[in-house]
């Protein structure tokens, strides 16, 4: 059969290799803005919808349904679910065997509880409390194989509580059993008070657990990995084995509680070892060997494995033998003879003792609750179902509240009995119900027969069932190889639970798990990606040999959420990859920048006073004083003060063509708007000459001289990288501080002539950007792309011809032609292909260089001729229909357009009209990068359908042009 499966799998894999699949998708390059325009979002379902509810019946129907009501009932009462789907023929026999075995084991455990807890509790009170607790967990519990009862390790924590009011001068706590006369009124009063302390502690423990369950604090267990739960259960198993040494060797010691109590008890056992009972040791070894042999016996019922109930036969057999002959071993008979009552009526706890026991109750509630949750999760993982931690907290809280009226100890999940119930074939809580009934029946009718049962039998049964929890210690080497963090958490939880106790160890485990989870989730892992050749797949450059990097484009993948913890590491990583460092500005540098931007209007005066009735300029949104320097050449790689403002829309009546005005406002556009400059809101940008311009506009030489006074100008920056792409496909959360620093990063690199693009943002991240006011006219949704490949295509499409092919000095001017949306839709000559993929031609938009220097303040009215430029070999399709030959009426159109532009009044002679006009590129109908521009008059923006913008080239840009310098001279 296995060979057939392997052959089928190999045949399927070979068939998959033969039938290779390929896909060819042709679509436009989408950014977030264009994608939302074409594909509308669904309406928000946040619950704030305006629904007209007229009657109470409609009000209830909008919020309640039969399905929700049924789900709520099944959550509160889980037994209804397994009762409705109970398979009687398959599960009944296993549940009966498991219930009888658990019930028989629970009888001697209840009798020896007083011996371990060092408190004389009547046996029938323990039996009734255990029965009520089992029934309550059957109704409200969510674990199918859980057995509820008194757990002696939790009861051992009551030693500190019993020291508050010892009734026999502390002799029982110290391990000396001296039978006293209960007829003395003082002795009986002290005994009743000690029982009241135990009952009040159990009641307060149950109340705390109920509060934890109602508040939903069970989610804490979900943050604890499997390694932490295994380590805690292993530590509990060691504590159980240590406590059973009392029964194995037949000696009594003084138990300790608190830190290092584990080692104190070991020392006490070693001291008392010469008094060990050899008969008890022999009985213990006999039980262990019998249970070990029993593991080799396999029984199945209806294809369900059932282990032979050896514990049932051992308890019955040794009980019969002990009642026939004297075995000279330690039994529970000695302690039971000291108890004055067999049963005490239920009473209410003494609430006056609550302030004295609140710390002990809190410690008991934590240990008992999480022990139950850990054990339930461990068992549920073996049977492929899940448990509800909050529901279990409520269930165990009710169990302890009810058991407190019987003056019993704290109840929780019993590890040994739970394992016995699971391996004996128990499938549902019906087995626990059967076990509780058997236990109560035996304790009421035949309890005295079990008084002579050797305690070593119970110790052998418990140790044989808890030893498997120690097997995780042998798995530590493999756990270290799998995950070092989990291995470290395992060792920390185990060692703290052994050295400091179960309560403190649990707190340390939870805190350590939270810390490790937080560190791992917020630890920034930034990968530098490259492209797999001839694909749209991008992987880490360190993982594949054939991977290629795109010139001028850096792709970074963020593999964690962006928070205040790791956002600065992201910034440091980006600066490191582009070989730049940040350096704080000096005072004279800041003063020089302020002097060049503000005080030049008053002739260099530092202090000036004037009256301004207009609204104050809004404060910049992000302020910090630092500059970036190249590591290799800091003198030639500095940029201006990073001083970013909140860009708002200056005019709501702007046309679509105005949104495509380039970011750097040219001197010609400044001159054209000279009359309206005072009405334009000022925005402080690096090297923004509009900030320095006066209504009179000085001449070219003066403006160039003023520009040279700025100590750190981006005109000297020669970036080898023109675009940085951040892959946010693995980012699921960005906090407020991360958004602020991320915005600073975008503006800082923008001032360095490096564009930041973000790819693969989840919709929740985009909404977080919108809620935190991340976008404005400077940083828009056009910088957000749906995939990394979209961002790469856009980054390559915006490359311009740089200094490697064309020699552009500072006096050269670049002219870009833009069209309005209506002009693009009406004229077919400006259409472009609907896809960037699938074309043999590789055309990239470029700027036309004007060979002859032109005066800066001259006004140009030029048409640019379309030219094509070879790309970089990527799958770019920038198909354009070239503009047809110009007709004679083009000259009249040019004259008309020239008349529409605002003419300056002071210097009309500075406007030469060139004779030849080369035509410009037909740019795609996109708005990927809307830049800031001063507002135009509303009347002019409505009538002007085609605009021209002249940009001042501050520095050459790297580009790729295999045809070399093919531009025509103007």
From Swiss-Prot:
Q: What gene name does this entry carry?
A: SLC26A8
* Consequence when changing residue 954 to C: In SPGF3; there is a reduced interactions with CFTR and complete failure to activate CFTR-dependent anion transport
In Swiss-Prot or TrEMBL terms, this protein is called Testis anion transporter 1
Give the tissue specificity: Expression observed exclusively in testis, restricted to the meiotic phase of the germ cell. Abundant expression located in the seminiferous tubules, concentrated on the luminal side of the tubuli harboring the spermatocytes and spermatids.
Q: How is it modified after translation?
A: N-glycosylated.
State which residues carry a glycan (glycosylated): 192
Q: An example Gene Ontology cellular component term from the record?
A: sperm annulus
Region annotation (Disordered) maps to 858-970
